[in-house]
Each structure stands twice: as C-alpha cells, then as structure tokens.
C-alpha cells in the first residue's frame, strides 16, 4: 500500500511524505520531499537477540548525499562517492542525537538508519528533511519507538521567523538553528546566530516547535494507516533482591565519595575501587545464599552473579546519589554552587612560531589553541550539493586519548571531533573580520590537553584569545559555557560549567556561546522527555551570566586585540595590474611566477580581475616581489632610465638590451659612449647589466612592430632618477 501525504507549514513551505513504494524490504522506508529536494530514509533493526553482557544500544545513523542528486559528477579518479564528507557527518549527528533518546530503555538490538539524498534542487538543504524521514521510517516499521520526532530549520529575516528557509533566504537571516523535537518537548538544538538575545532564542524555539508538532501529527497519522504491529521485545528484568543487595552494599560509600570534593583522577580511582569491591562482595553474597543448581536453572539468579549486570546496578546507585545530592543539598561533586564556574587561567603567546596562541584552562579542562594566517591558496575547499566555495575561516578540534588519561590509536578524525570543531567554529565565525577588513585565511587549531567537561567551549574561549593574541581584528570576544540539568519530577536544578560526570549522569548538555551582546551559537541534547520552556529560559539566563563571567576573565588577560601581527605571520600586500598582464606575470607554464617565488620567498596569488596578493614573512621579500611585478607590467616611457641586460651584440650596429621583462631595445653604436666606438664588443659583453635611457619609441610601418631606441650615453649624462620605472 502506497501512502502519500502532504503538509503546508506556511510561507510556501510544502513537505510531502511517501511510504510503501521504495525499499520495501527494509523494516521501514520513507521518502520526504520539499521542492525538488528528496531524501529516502530506511531503518533496519536486527532480530538477533543481543549478547547477555551488552549494556548499550548499537544505533548507527548514516547520512549520504549523492552527487547524481544534483546532476554532478564526484571528483577523484574513480568518480564515485567514498567516505562521508564533513557536511554528511554533521547531518548524521543531527539525526542521531535527536532520535537516540526516543528508543525505549532496554532495547539493545542493532539498528541502522540510512538517509540518502536522491534529489537536490540546490536550494533546500536536505539535513532536516533527513531527520523527519528517519523518524517516519521508524514509525511505519515494527520497531519499538516512543514518539515521532521531527526536525526543522528556523531562520529570521527582517524580524520575521521562517521555517525551513532555503539557502538564498539564509543569506539574509540573522539566525540558522536546527530544532529536533517531539509533540511535547524539544530534544535537540544546534545553530548559529548573529548575537541574538535569550528571549529571541526562546521565541525561535517556540516557533520551530509549532511546525514540529504538525509534522509529528502527520507521522502519527501515516503510522496509523500503515498499522504495522510493534515487534515484541523483553528487556532484561533485574531481580529486586540484586538491586537491594547492591544498594545496601554501596550506597553509603558512594554517598561519602560524592560529598568529598576530589579531582577527576582521584575520584575515578576511588570509584573504580568501590565498583571492584562491590562486584566481588555481591557475587560472594549470592554464591553463599544460592546453590550452583539455581544459577544454572534460574536465569534471574544467574543475573545476580553477572559482573556486567552488577556493574550496571552500582552505576544506577551512583547516578541516584549524585542527582539527589544536587537536588536536595544544592551541592556538586567538586563542591561548587550550582551556578559557579570553575577557576580559569589564561596564558597567551606561549607558542613562539605560531601566529597567535593561547592556553585556556578551566578547572581540569585545558585547550591549547593556535592560529595560522595564510593566503587564499590556504582556504578550505567545500563542495556539497548546495554550494561549492572556499572557506577562509575554519577551526579544527583534536581530542587525543591522553587528555582523559587513556591510551588509544591516532588516526582519522572521529565524528565527535568534527562536531565539536564545527560548533566552536560557528561560535567564533560571527565575530571574524570580513575579507575586505582582513584578507587572510585563518586556521584555528584547538588541541585538548585535559578534559573534564566542556572542551568544545574551552576551544571557543581559547580560539578567541588566540585570535586576539595574533592581532586578528575580531569584532568582539566570544566565550562559551556548557549547562547541565538534573530533573526528578517537578524538581530540577540547572548546572553551570558541567563536569564530565555531571554530563554523563545528568539529563541535558546545553552549550551556549556568545559575546556580551548576544548568542552566537548553541547546541543542546536532552536525555529526558518533558523539558518545559521555563527550564529552558532558566538555563539560558544562567548561561548568560556564566558567559559574561568568563568574558570578564578573558578581558583581564587581553583587553583588546593586539595592534600588530605576529613576527612570523605573513605580511600581505596587494597590487592591481591590467588583466592583459596576468599572462605575462604567470609566464609559460607558470615559469615566471615560479621564479619570482623562488627568488623572493614570497607567495603570490592572482585573481581574475588582476588583483595580485603578495604574502611573505619578510618585508625584503615582499618588496622584491613587488618590484619584479611592477617591472613586468610597466609600460615603456620615453625619458625613463632602466637597468637592462645586454642580450645580443652587433659590432657594427649596436647592442640589443632587455630593459623591461620580455622587452628589448636597440642601443645604436653611436649611443654607447661619448667617444667614438668602432667595435661594440670592445665596450659591452652579453649578459652585462647597463643603465639605459629610453629616447624614442617608433612603430615599424612595414612589420607593425614597436621599436625602442635606447641610449647609454644619455643615461650617463642624466642624473639617476629614483622612480618606479627604474629597475633597481
């Protein structure tokens, strides 16, 4: 049965959802369309029973953009799509983060969601359509799922909110935020803004949620028509006696540990010791009270001596203890108040050869951030279905295993690192100078050296400081903070600057960055249902206060951007030449421009309009390259004196001298010296440099060629001219 339904979200944004035609062997498949952009989402969940010791949900979300969707060919030798691009990874993360909390507890079957863009009108982005399609594919399947989820993008143009703005509308929008949610709550946020207020942010979320409710209702309607029975699954039931035994053995010890402020490593060591002891004590307890026959015949009894199950029960006690400590006593693991930011230390310029650097430490989270300034040639190429451009401002985030005291392999960058780097980049991008203000390509690299929560926000702070240290004229400094939430029933507590444990054991991770005047980026993930707008408003206001506190600490370290670039940063000089001179500067096969680069050490970039940018770390190299280019493009002027090179000698006629690049003139034998010259080779040698004066320019009526008459004698008689035409 093919079902096709359409919904109008207003403002001409019409979305259609179809199921039952494509990919019918998947557990669920849906095609979503807006304009001529179409995505197909499929979901398959294994029916194979998970291993007994598995304690996680193996959900894999993949998002792929086919070049054929936009009538394009992939690059490379094989001309086919390969590993996912950064855009595809970020889109997959948007979908994964919104869907994952909505699967029922205890559902541990391997599940794979694949979202493929099959048509692109290159105007409507497919990422939020992919989130809608993925949720609807699950809804029409037999996979257990709590509630439909929808994603929308919200923009604001001239003060009016727009749902799912296209790329042309986003150019004029002062915010770009992706919102994922169910009919009752918001579960995911991510976006960038041009310094909007907390109230405006809340209004944007409410506007987006109204559209989400409509899309969720449509999904429920489609699922009801498909009417596929939900497959049965039985989550592992933990025996009450095991739960109680573990609680009695560990609750007091874990509570004492929770109320003792400790560093991350000390807490981890002591917690691990408690886990080890309690697991052994629990197994000994049940082995002493039950027979071996009971363990082999009663699955519930077997769970009581399973180390993985016992470990999970200890974790539940630890989580409950920490949450009640925060809710009942307003006390945190490190002893801080709920809205208190950890101590901050800042060092600037600690990497001598970098073009700007900062070491930002907040508690036990530390980021070493450097900037590198380059030319257009250093821009990052971006090629996807909706755009092909060069990024001149980008941030790379690295999270090596040693920053959390672990070993691990170093290789390709993971999805988490790409996501964190993208958030930090979007946070700072809003205050970066325009190309007209600062023609450099800017690369920021954040290396996390220590991590105990909020390393992406440390990258925002460190990135801002490194830019200011490097003399990059940013509009305003930006800081970031990660907020957390503990919620039990009607009671809740919002936490500022969360630790890793508070993130892991809490209900929300809400990162907010911005200037003193407003928010520039945000990212939120929610693990619970029922987040109301009052809590969100509280979190935004508390984040604002924390952000301003951090900005105050940053401004103490560096009140304003340095007035000069770093010593080793390239110095850029621009010159504009006639377009018809570009070929002369490049030379045959790039020979001329390559020789200039080799001789001067300068990097040269030429635009199609004749703008030439020279980048060099020394003023000498810059001046030498500039002089060479001026000489290459100079027009011969009668009366100017040049330094030329003898190219050919005709003893009875004179000498041919190259006085400008690729431009020769004749020094007649009578113009070589004031004295009589009978043989030119007695006075000049091939390759010799001589000072000549251009005395006449004539066009040969027979050949049409321009002929230049030079004089060494006249140049010697004239005083040396210090002007731009003279080749010194």
Curated annotation (Swiss-Prot):
Highest classification ranks of the organism: Bacteria, Pseudomonadati, Chlorobiota, Chlorobiia, Chlorobiales
Gene behind this protein: pnp
Family statement drawn from the similarity comment of this UniProt entry: Belongs to the polyribonucleotide nucleotidyltransferase family.
Enzyme Commission number(s) from the entry: 2.7.7.8
Taxonomic source organism: Pelodictyon phaeoclathratiforme (strain DSM 5477 / BU-1)
This protein's name: Polyribonucleotide nucleotidyltransferase
Keywords, comma-separated and alphabetical: Cytoplasm, Magnesium, Metal-binding, Nucleotidyltransferase, RNA-binding, Transferase
Entries under SUPFAM superfamilies matching the protein: Eukaryotic type KH-domain (KH-domain type I), Nucleic acid-binding proteins, Ribonuclease PH domain 2-like, Ribosomal protein S5 domain 2-like
Domain of life of the native organism: Bacteria
Annotated ranges, domain S1 motif: 639-713
